[in-house]
Swiss-Prot record:
InterPro entries: Astacin-like_dom, MetalloPept_cat_dom_sf, Metallopeptidase_nem, Peptidase_M12A, Peptidase_Metallo. Keywords: Disulfide bond, EGF-like domain, Glycoprotein, Hydrolase, Metal-binding, Metalloprotease, Protease, Secreted, Signal, Zinc, Zymogen. Residues 1-21 form the signal peptide. Its cofactor is Zn(2+). This is Zinc metalloproteinase nas-17.
């Protein structure tokens, strides 16, 4: 079998950098250890909100949405403390721009607006939930320097909770309190249908989900074991953006016919917001920085180096893609043969590979970043996508991925179709 090689490397001159050597990422919970007044690892609550969660005040769902207040007209005012570093300003500005370019939420810098967020260097990574009125603080310390963490805290300030606190989380996670300190047990409480509502499916790749070992070894265990290393990802998922849009009732007067589960962009109604791995006005094209591969009825091999030409660690991901196509209605199969130069970690937040094989093109598929997890190597992945995107992410140096791929005659159309239960988009299951 002939292995075709390729290289996707970026010379690092525009990316935000966090240091010259690999630095252990500290999640929101770890950064806030010892900080008073924190619930759920990184959330600050007003006294009224605490009474709601503690059950000392009873409210209807309509009243609850008033407790977790939205920003009027989806416009958020903010300012930076003088000590807020230039790197953090760039990172936070990038996070706000990402949200505003894919939703109807807009951000405006102002230190005199009646309601505003104050960004401060100190106190770990934490935020209040929703708009509290007046000035509220968003803490963004030195352990927060990753793009998805910036978005994570902003999403709290927009009124969104953690994925692992959803009232239906027990369908997707097993929660162990064995190694959780007694004073931390409250961080693992679920919300109720009376305090929150779910607008999207449970998303293992959400930037609002903590990792497997956040509160202690094996505290949050995925009931789908394929997702164990995906939990804690800080890339920002498509469904994270959908969550914001639903929260703020974003939309356009006229909807486009977006493909592959995309939606009309409330920030620019002439184009669609596309799931990761898809691009173009209507989400029917490959993203830039994509290598296109054509599957045959026999196994073909391919390897690719992707990432940076330097070992500096960045605060955001360099994304590159493979796009595997086959004749219409054929089923594509992929095998990951080797992962070289990957950093094994929960959340795969240094580098990772995602084969988008599931029927719902919007959901995050399991990420792979651990060469020692040999049970996932040389295993046939049967895709319900044609073309099948493979997403490669990198924050530190470069990595090498080797795959085999082919198509088989099993018609995709022989699969049943369903929805995610939250909207009407149909896909193969």
């Amino acid at each position: 079998m002939f292995l075709r090689p390729s290289t996707l490397l970026l010379t690092l001159f525009l990316a935000l950098v966090a240091g010259s050597a690999i630095r252990k990422d500290v999640d929101e919970f770890d950064s806030n250890k010892g900080k008073d007044g924190i619930v759920d690892g990184d959330i600050m609550l007003t006294e009224a909100q605490l009474r709601i969660l503690n059950g000392t005040a009873k409210r209807s769902k309509r009243q609850i949405t008033k407790i977790w207040k939205k920003w009027p007209d989806a416009k958020v005012f903010y300012y930076y403390e003088n000590e807020f570093t230039s790197l953090k300003r760039e990172l936070m500005s990038y996070a706000m721009a990402h949200i505003s370019s894919n939703t109807c939420v807009k951000f405006q810098e102002s230190n005199s607006a009646t309601n505003r967020i104050r960004f401060t260097n100190t106190g770990g990574c934490a935020s209040y939930i929703g708009m509290n009125g007046g000035e509220q603080t968003l803490w963004f310390g030195d352990g927060c320097l990753i793009f998805g963490t910036a978005v994570h805290e902003i999403m709290h300030s927009l009124g969104l909770f953690h994925t692992h606190s959803r009232f239906d989380r027990d369908n997707f996670l097993s929660v162990s309190y064995k190694d959780v300190p007694e004073n931390m047990v409250g961080n693992l409480e679920k919300e109720t249908e009376q305090t929150t509502y779910n607008a999207v499916p449970f998303e293992y790749g959400s930037t609002m989900l903590y990792r497997y070992n956040t509160f202690g070894e094996g505290t949050l265990v995925s009931k789908n074991e394929d997702y164990q290393k995906t939990m804690g990802l800080r890339r920002v998922s498509f469904y994270d953006l959908v969550n914001i849009n639903v929260r703020y009732s974003c939309g356009c007067a006229k909807s486009l016919t977006c493909e592959n589960g995309g939606y009309t962009n409330p920030s620019n109604c002439a184009t669609c917001v596309c799931p990761t791995g898809f691009a173009g006005t209507l989400c029917n094209e490959a993203p830039s920085n994509t290598i296109k591969l054509t599957a045959e009825s026999y196994w073909k091999g391919y390897w690719v180096n992707f990432g940076y030409s330097t070992s500096i660690q960045t605060t955001n991901y360099y994304l590159a893609y493979l796009w595997i196509t086959a004749p219409a209605d054929k089923t594509i199969e992929v095998k990951i043969m080797d992962l070289s130069g990957f950093t094994c970690s929960y959340g795969c937040n240094y580098n990772g590979v995602e084969v988008k094989y599931m029927g719902d093109p919007r959901i995050t598929n399991p990420l792979r970043c651990c060469a020692q997890d040999t049970e996932y190597l040389n295993q046939v992945i049967s895709s319900k996508q044609n073309p099948t995107p493979i997403v490669m992410q990198q924050r530190y140096g470069s990595s090498k991925l080797t795959i085999h791929y082919r198509y088989v005659d099993t018609p995709l159309s022989s699969n049943k179709k369903s929805t995610n239960g939250y909207d009407n988009y149909q896909y193969y299951v």
